[in-house]
Amino acid sequence: MTSAEHLTKGQQAEDRALAYLEQQGLKLVERNVRYPFGEIDLIMRQGHKWIFIEVKYRQSKQFGGALQAVSRGKIARLNRAASHYMQLNQIDAQCRFDLLAIDGDDIQWITNAF
């Protein structure tokens, strides 16, 4: 798979994740927020709560699946990026970190994942 194909698959997975989460009542704030030290795939709100979401996609579970693809380093970078985002935007509210794992056609949403 070329890097362009990989990006397209990743974008499609994020689009699926966003549609799924909006169906669950979450509201999109921003997507693909990037800092030199980390990236946030989706930032959403549910009432007054801010939700930072990592989206992981795998075509199948053959090599461990999407859930196993989240490393401690990735979690640390997501935490740092979310803290930075909240400081920059002067947000003083509850937040949580969710994981949306997509393995082929299977979607698994884990709230308070980290």
From Swiss-Prot:
Family: Belongs to the UPF0102 family.
Pfam families assigned to the protein according to its UniProt record, in alphabetical order: UPF0102
Name of this chain's protein: UPF0102 protein Shew_0226
NCBIfam families cross-referenced by the UniProt entry: PRK12497.1-3, YraN family protein
MF GO annotations: nucleic acid binding
Transmembrane segment boundaries: none
Annotated organism of origin: Shewanella loihica (strain ATCC BAA-1088 / PV-4)
Origin: domain of life: Bacteria
Record-annotated disulphide pairs: none
